[in-house]
Amino acid sequence: MKIILSALLAAGLATAGQASAADELALAKAKNCMTCHTVDKKLVGPGYKEVAAKYKDDKTATAKLAVKIKAGGKGAWGEIPMPPNNVTEDEAKRLAAWVLSMK
């Protein structure tokens, strides 16, 4: 019985992680992030994998990116500024963590 419960719990956790990534992609689409960004390559703004690589050793990256996602920014990735986004602080943190999880 314990083995079955452990297996079900493990399967549930694995599925929860996948659902979370899908949820964050849906959030990025809903907030129009994907209009200027893609996961793999530069569109108007940098690709998310490039952003994750740039900040991989920065312990404060999630907080920094959450601020940029919410308030907008310019100069870090070229001439075109990123406009402020209509996201809550929680959504900005979730999106930042998701972007930084890209490999």
Where do the protein language model's features map onto the residues?
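Stable alpha-helical elements in mature extracytoplasmic
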Residues: 24, 61, 65, 91-92
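Sequence/structural segment immediately N-terminal to covalent heme-attachment motifs in c-type
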Residues: 22-39
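Axial heme c-ligation environment in periplasmic c-type cytochrome domains
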Residues: 35, 44-55, 68-98
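Domain-level signature for proteins that mediate thiol-based redox and metal-cofactor handling
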Residues: 18-19, 58, 62-63, 71
